A protein has these predicted regions:
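Conserved phosphate-binding/catalytic region of the ribokinase-like
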Residues: 1, 31, 194-289
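Short, basic and Ser/Thr-rich N-terminal targeting/leader segments
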Residues: 53, 90-93
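Hydrophobic residues at beta-strand termini and immediately following loops
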Residues: 60, 108, 227-230
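Glycine-rich phosphate/adenosyl-contacting loop at the front of the ribokinase-like
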Residues: 1-60
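Ribokinase/PfkB-type carbohydrate-kinase core domain
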Residues: 1-11, 73-87, 95-225
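A glycine-rich beta-to-alpha transition motif near the start of alpha/beta enzyme domains, typified by
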Residues: 56-83
């Protein structure tokens, strides 16, 4: 088995618009505080984070044959330590993200790629068999390859993002995962849910709480333990990618042998490094400015 992590899921080209508050659902005018374009996508964020930490990582993602896709390919190809396996999705996924200084976000999907089965799926299937960890982010490709990932016998990590506890789309990811990450945006009180996830077979379930850090529940098969980690205080420039960086930091630390508490602290430190850049990860600063 290699030390390489396989990441499957979205990459996007994003326009970020900073606002002092998220718009109300009524007709009105609102002025932006600023805007910029950058790399997006939860899987790109995780892969960038792992590469920056020195972890061998291969990103399997879908990017369109359009100008935004050309930009994404050129940028990601310039990131040291990041191996890419790209599928032409005709259209590149594009988002318009409205962001507040508090990290609140509304994501408007401007376009989505063609993510139908393709011969390239076989490359991802082959890579899974020798991966230290398989990260399956929410996407059609990841979802249809869940049975293959489970058959590979390698640990599966997933990120449910703002899961509400009932979404049918998320359920196969939840059922397959050994390690589950999510945020608290829509779950209500997260601790009972995390305990339920671990009770159903996951060995670790983590919920990020923004400025309040994160909580987690772990199990070694006999003992269930609750964990908490504080956020590392920084002056926040942009919260995009912080959750991906947190998960990357935890994953890298655990593969290096850290226990859960030490890994959560490593995740918090890595997340803090992303909060002080306007890009998905500080490794993009030198490329995008």
């Amino acid at each position: 088995m290699s030390s390489r992590v396989v990441v499957s899921g979205p990459t996007s080209w994003n326009r970020i618009v900073q606002v002092d508050h998220l718009p109300e659902p009524v007709p009105h005018m609102q002025f932006a505080l600023g805007d910029h374009e950058t790399v997006g996508g939860t899987s790109a964020g995780k892969a960038l984070g792992l590469a920056a930490l020195g972890r061998p990582v291969e990103l399997f993602t879908v990017i369109g044959s359009d100008p935004d896709g050309d930009r994404l390919r050129a940028i990601l190809a310039g990131v040291a330590g990041l191996e890419l396996d790209l599928v032409d999705g005709v259209r590149t996924e594009r988002h318009l993200n409205l962001m507040t200084e508090a990290g609140e976000r509304v994501s408007i999907y401007l376009s989505t790629p063609d993510d139908r089965p393709s011969p390239a799926d076989r490359r991802l299937e082959a890579a899974m068999t020798d991966a230290a960890v398989i990260v399956l982010d929410l996407s059609e490709r990841s979802r249809r390859l869940i049975p293959t990932a489970r058959a590979a016998g390698r640990p599966i990590w997933t990120d449910l993002h703002d899961y509400d506890g009932t979404s049918e789309y998320h359920q196969p990811f939840l059922d397959a995962a050994d390690v589950v990450f999510m945020n608290a945006d829509r779950i209500g009180e997260p601790m009972p849910f995390l305990r339920r996830v671990v009770g159903n077979g996951a060995r670790l379930a983590v919920c990020t709480l923004g400025a309040d850090g994160a909580i987690a529940v772990s199990s070694d098969g006999a003992t269930v333990v609750e964990h908490r980690v504080d956020a590392v205080p920084v002056d926040v420039i942009d919260a995009n990618g912080a959750g991906d960086a947190f998960m990357s930091g935890v994953l890298h630390a655990m593969l290096d042998g850290a226990d859960v508490d030490a890994a959560l602290e490593a995740g918090a430190r890595h997340a803090a490094s992303v909060l002080v850049t306007r890009h998905l990860h500080p490794s993009l600063d030198a490329i995008l400015g």
